[in-house]
Amino acid sequence: MFSVNKRTQAFSVFLFFFSVPKVIRYLNKQRSLKEEEKRLEEFQLLLSKLKDVHLPLDLIVEILKKLPTKSLMRFRCVSKPWSFIISKRRDFVESIMARSLRQPPHKLPVFIFHQCDPGTFFTVSSTFSQSTKPKVSIMPGRNHYNAFRYQYVRGFICCSSSVYDLVTIYNPTTRQCLPLPKIESMVLSPKRHKHCYFGYDHVMNEYKVLAMVNDSQELTQTFHVFTLGRDCPQWRKIRGNIDYELISVSRAGVCIDGTIYYVAVRRKDNENYGELFMMSFDVKSERFYHVRTPETLWSPKCTERGLFNHQGKLGCISSNENNISMWIMENAEKQEWSNITFGLLEYPGGDFRTFSGITPAGEIFSMCYPFYNMPLCVHYYNVKQKSYRRVEIESTRLKTRKQPRDIIRVFAIHDFVENTMWL
């Protein structure tokens, strides 16, 4: 038996070795904070010395273009001219986005985690190795997780809900969330819901959100547009140049070269729906158009369909029990399509019939939404090489619920670009 002193000494040694890693991490963190504070002090000292020195505006812009995005976010507070250059000047924002596109693409996406609350987003950048399992902290989700839809356009993410009257724009670069105002005189109900689509007009440099409100009881449909960055931020009601029977479905749309593409269905009455159509919305002119598609694309045997941007071309993927078909619109003016059909072998853990997206390299990927104690997995299928790969990301959640509603919402972006524009 150990004496009291020996047991106390052994316990002290145990605590020492147990706490050493924590102490080291704490000291490293404090050291990095001190280094950051020192750099900021040096920069402020440099600014004070340069108060009376006049630098040409073009030279300032060129210097700022060389800085990393994280530094640019800090330097917004230097002065109003700097803030305007970094966040509002179009040529500067475009140059940062172009620089981001020139960087070698990552095999793994940037993950956007959403708590099913429009004001609660957080981002995990995937610069890690595929062989590792990086840990991320995931907050428990709320009910109606599948009522949210996400659309990514030029560094921005639009999160909307067909159940709730709310729309949020999120910029992962600036970590800024912008909840849009509610549409006037609109009360959502089981018989009245809305679908939103996000687009960009490169001619006028405007980001717009299109909302289509459908009332299945009154058999009416109204159209509303919100333009980001205007002095009077509010929804505008527009006149839709399409039949009121054509209503949008709950699937996410895609914006390519100033045109939003989405899927619509022809309504026969309050309960029954007919054939499917591909529709487009020109972001600049705010007009709707029909898109000519192959008849087999809307086969009743297809259970899942999804739209995507494939190297600047509109793509549509559909699946049935045996096959998956990829359709690519090779010519937007003539609306000519090409097709690749392939069968999928059974792959443990990955259901590629549940389409999540496609990488710039042409890999189809499917994501599983984990429960509180399961890792997040991304499954990839290379169409050309007919090969699979699986990426697992460990997640830590608050283990307070064990219901299916605890599934988190994860949005993966493979062609992410940094956008310094302030919302």
Swiss-Prot record:
Domain of life the protein comes from: Eukaryota
Domain F-box: residue ranges: 49-95
InterPro entries: F-box-assoc_dom_typ3 (IPR013187), F-box-assoc_interact_dom (IPR017451), F-box-like_dom_sf (IPR036047), F-box_dom (IPR001810), Gal_Oxase/kelch_b-propeller (IPR011043)
Coiled-coil region: none
Transmembrane portions of the chain: none
CDD domains per record: F-box_AtFBW1-like (cd22157)
Pfam families the UniProt entry points to: F-box (PF00646), FBA_3 (PF08268)
Gene3D superfamilies: 1.20.1280.50
NCBIfam families: F_box_assoc_1
Protein name per UniProt: F-box protein At1g52495
Biological source species: Arabidopsis thaliana (Mouse-ear cress)
